[in-house]
């Protein structure tokens, strides 16, 4: 065998060895199971029938996730959800998305069951009227941590009591992995939820600025009343309970067109990735969980 032939065989053999050892798609490990996300929605004042569909479609389009909807079509502030009747209601889910509007649900055992899942480590994403749910006592005054009516606020990280008339909100992001790559934006007509308290340990992600026109009542008292500017924190994170469970919340999302907005859905999806531990501090998501 001449030298040229020997060299060819040596190169061919080495290349063949590399090919055999190279990992195939299956050798790299199986595709991880999709994130199991439970959306709990219903209650007063919003088109949850539409918004749950928008959230499911928007999240599943962006994430390697399966979104399950627990929807109660009731329209009252006393709306409850059958799933919460079980102590292990969150079993099997990687994240709970709270989209309830249940301000007058004051059953302490019921609320404790909800909170226990998060204390035990199940992450949460809270949207809009979830901030105005499960409240009792003198909730219009600042509530101290540890108070009888503080449980829900301790999970959220912010206490809010209301909002003014709808008008566009200028959203300005702070520097954080969740907001990495997102541009400031202005919503359509939306509700700017106030901040009675932003608790220690809460990390602000975004602030909102809104020009509020005088109401009819204000104009009746003062015909020369002028528009005023209101500002509030509109998105934040919190670490809740002994397990420091990750909680992401945004008070935006009253109207369907806001929930359908790409900018809103991108933000919520990134918040969910962060809550479940699949978004780095540098803002880079775990590639296995994005589409």
Task: Walk through the language-model features, giving the residues of each.
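Loop/turn elements at helix/coil->beta-strand transitions in domains of secreted/extracellular proteins
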Residues: 33-36, 62-67, 91-96, 119-125, ...
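Bacterial N-terminal signal peptides
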Residues: 9-21
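An acidic, glycine-rich "communication" segment
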Residues: 52, 127-216, 284-291
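N-terminal secretory signal peptides that target proteins for export/translocation
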Residues: 1-6
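Aromatic-Pro/Gly-enriched surface loop or interdomain linker
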Residues: 27-93, 279-280, 285-291
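Extracellular ligand-binding/catalytic regions of CAZymes and related secreted enzymes
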Residues: 28-35, 50, 61, 212-291
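Short alpha-beta junction capping motif
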Residues: 36-41, 89-138
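Solvent-exposed loop/turn segments at secondary-structure junctions
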Residues: 43-46, 73-76, 97, 101-105, ...
């Amino acid at each position: 065998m001449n030298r040229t032939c020997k060299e060819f065989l040596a190169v061919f053999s080495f290349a063949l060895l590399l090919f055999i050892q190279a990992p195939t798609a299956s050798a790299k490990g199986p595709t991880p199971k999709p994130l199991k996300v439970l959306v709990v929605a219903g209650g007063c004042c919003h088109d949850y029938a539409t918004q749950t569909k928008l959230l499911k479609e928007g999240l599943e389009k962006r994430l390697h996730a399966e979104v399950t909807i627990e929807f109660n079509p009731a329209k009252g502030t006393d709306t409850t959800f059958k799933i919460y009747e079980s102590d292990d209601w969150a079993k099997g889910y990687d994240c709970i998305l709270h989209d309830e509007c249940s301000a007058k649900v004051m059953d302490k055992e019921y609320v404790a069951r909800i909170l226990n899942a998060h204390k035990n480590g199940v992450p949460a994403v809270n949207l809009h009227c979830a901030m105005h749910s499960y409240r009792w006592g003198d909730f219009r005054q600042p509530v101290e941590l540890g108070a009888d009516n503080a449980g829900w606020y301790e999970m959220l990280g912010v206490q809010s009591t209301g909002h003014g008339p709808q008008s566009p909100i200028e959203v300005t992001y702070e520097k954080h992995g969740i907001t990495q790559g997102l541009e400031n934006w202005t919503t359509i007509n939306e509700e700017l939820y106030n901040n009675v308290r932003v608790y220690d340990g809460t990390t602000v992600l975004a602030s909102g600025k809104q020009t509020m026109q005088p109401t009819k009542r204000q104009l009746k008292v003062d015909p020369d009343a002028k528009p005023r500017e209101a500002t509030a924190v509109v998105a934040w994170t919190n670490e809740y309970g002994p397990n420091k469970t990750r909680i992401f919340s945004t008070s935006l999302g009253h109207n369907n067109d806001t929930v359908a907005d790409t900018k809103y859905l991108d933000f919520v999806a990134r918040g969910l990735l962060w809550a479940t531990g699949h978004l780095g501090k540098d803002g880079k998501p775990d590639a296995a969980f994005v589409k």
